[in-house]
């Protein structure tokens, strides 16, 4: 069946002399694998289109009983290469693709998640002041759509509203717990709280803001780069744990050195 859909390229692998196999996250079919016959031939109309992180409109022959779908046509909608080169943007897109690969299953359709991904790539494929914050915004949507959205407004251990406690100066640090999933006020040293990650107050406030924000407004707020980067790390660890996956911290450290040292 010949069908049209939108897709984000998650991975590309050379196949034989001139072809390519790609993993795509699509709007209408979830994650699928496709083959581009002759797609590496410079004369092919598919040549140069299927690059990791690109948002495409694709026409493919889709058969439910086939592991590899055949691409007929494609056009680029958004590409990381269209804006001025930026290691910060490339790092953010790499993180976005990494978390998508571990969090989405084959042929699991989720239009709301794809729409959030499309809006995020629209922001990242243009000049963007807050690339890490855009990825953190997407991770919050991904976590929500995956069914393990953390409680952000109320402490998961006491049930108390967190913001009034912070305004009273009752806490310097918080914790993002895994089970139950949510933000927790500090637990006295003599007590054992649920496992989780340290969540600095300023990073918590950023998470709370992004959870309520339209991504189109993300460049209108002043976000310290260290806070958005740390929030990305915390959310990626949270998401990875719920997907029973150990994130590649080595790759993240390498990229951080390139960007910030």
From Swiss-Prot:
Checking SUPFAM superfamilies in the record gives: ArfGap/RecO-like zinc finger, Nucleic acid-binding proteins
| Keyword annotations of the record | DNA damage, DNA recombination, DNA repair
Keyword set includes DNA repair: yes
Q: Please provide, in alphabetical order, the Gene Ontology terms of the cellular component aspect for this entry.
A: bacterial nucleoid
One Pfam family it belongs to: RecO_C
- Is the DNA damage keyword given for this protein? yes
Which GO biological process entries does UniProt record here? DNA recombination; double-strand break repair
Its biological purpose: Involved in DNA repair and RecF pathway recombination.
Protein family according to the UniProt entry = Belongs to the RecO family.
Q: What is this protein's name?
A: DNA repair protein RecO
Source organism: Chlorobium phaeobacteroides (strain BS1)
């Amino acid at each position: 069946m010949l069908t049209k859909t939108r897709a984000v390229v998650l991975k590309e692998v050379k196949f034989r002399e001139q072809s390519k196999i790609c993993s795509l996250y699509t709007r209408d079919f979830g994650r699928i694998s496709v083959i581009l016959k002759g797609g590496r031939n410079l004369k092919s109309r598919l040549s140069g289109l299927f690059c990791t992180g690109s948002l495409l409109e694709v026409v493919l022959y889709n058969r439910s009983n086939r592991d590899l779908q055949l691409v007929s046509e494609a056009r680029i909608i958004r590409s990381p290469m269209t804006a001025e080169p930026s290691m910060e943007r490339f790092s953010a897109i790499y993180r976005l693709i990494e978390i998508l690969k571990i969090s989405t299953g084959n042929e699991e359709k989720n239009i709301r998640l794809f729409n959030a991904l499309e809006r995020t790539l629209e922001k990242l494929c243009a000049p963007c002041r807050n690339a890490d914050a855009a990825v953190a915004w997407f991770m919050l949507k991904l976590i929500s759509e995956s069914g393990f959205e953390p409680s952000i407004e109320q402490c998961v251990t006491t049930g108390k509203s967190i913001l009034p406690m912070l305004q009273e100066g009752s806490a310097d640090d918080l914790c993002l717990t895994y089970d139950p999933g949510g933000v927790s006020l500090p637990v006295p040293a003599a007590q054992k709280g649920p496992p989780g990650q340290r969540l600095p107050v300023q990073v918590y406030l950023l998470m709370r803001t992004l959870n309520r924000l339209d991504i189109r407004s993300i460049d209108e707020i002043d976000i310290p780069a260290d806070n958005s980067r740390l929030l990305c790390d915390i959310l990626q660890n949270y998401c990875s744990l719920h997907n029973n996956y150990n994130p590649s911290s080595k790759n993240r450290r390498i990229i951080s050195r390139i960007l910030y040292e």
